[in-house]
């Protein structure tokens, strides 16, 4: 029986789920996640949360008996099932107001039904990709990138997952493209880069131009694959 079970695990095609909370299509976050998924060399699925209807968890605990949300009939149930069926998961987000975005937060909370009695996410390899507009050298502002990584990492740790690593990307403050970034008195450009900064002087940060982030995304994918291989 043990030999048969091992053979079944060996024959099973591994699948890695990648979930992006970025609402912008083809964003830095999306492209980094897709690169990490590609680097696994395994079957993958890319989920764009903005394309789904996800309500927040209502903390009713009605999911205890069935491991399934009973309080809101939305896409959160489908997404939780995808996470349950996947062998590994990478969560990618951006960090408005120095924390993970609302779509990613709602997604994580809606995975709560998978916890009860069975721990369906336990043991699965997982990773994080976080985009932050605040450069690491700016110590006057909150370390939003680190805070985003921690939010995802702590979720995975609390569910008993095997957190294998994180990727941090330097993103772009929305004020760069709103049309008023240079003159708005609450401009994020001024807050982050100083009063003399302009849309033109700050420019646009692209994932592909950040070599450390590129390497880290590929390495994350390889680590996910390695952790899955070690389980077989």
Where in the sequence are the language-model features?
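Short, glycine-/small-residue-rich phosphate/pyrophosphate-handling segment
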Residues: 120-170
């Amino acid at each position: 029986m043990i030999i048969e079970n091992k053979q079944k695990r060996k024959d099973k095609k591994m699948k890695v789920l990648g979930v992006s909370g970025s609402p912008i299509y083809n964003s830095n976050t999306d492209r980094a996640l897709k690169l990490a998924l590609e680097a696994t060399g395994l079957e993958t699925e890319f989920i764009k949360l903005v394309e789904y209807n996800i309500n927040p968890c209502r903390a009713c605990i009605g999911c205890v008996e069935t491991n399934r949300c009973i309080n809101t009939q939305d896409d959160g149930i489908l997404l939780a099932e995808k996470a349950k069926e996947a062998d590994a998961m990478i969560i990618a987000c951006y960090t408005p107001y120095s924390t993970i975005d609302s779509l990613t937060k709602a997604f994580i909370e809606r995975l709560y039904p998978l916890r009860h009695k069975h721990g369906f996410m336990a043991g699965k390899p997982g990773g994080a990709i976080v985009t932050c507009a605040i450069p690491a050298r700016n110590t006057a502002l909150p370390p939003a990138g680190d805070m985003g990584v921690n939010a995802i990492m702590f979720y995975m740790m609390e569910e008993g997952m095997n957190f294998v690593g994180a990727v941090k990307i330097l993103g772009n403050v929305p004020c760069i493209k709103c049309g008023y970034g240079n003159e708005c008195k609450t401009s994020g450009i001024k807050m982050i880069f100083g009063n003399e900064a302009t849309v033109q002087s700050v420019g646009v940060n692209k994932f592909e131009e950040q070599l450390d982030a590129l390497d880290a995304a590929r390495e994350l994918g390889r680590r996910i694959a390695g952790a899955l291989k070690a389980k077989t």
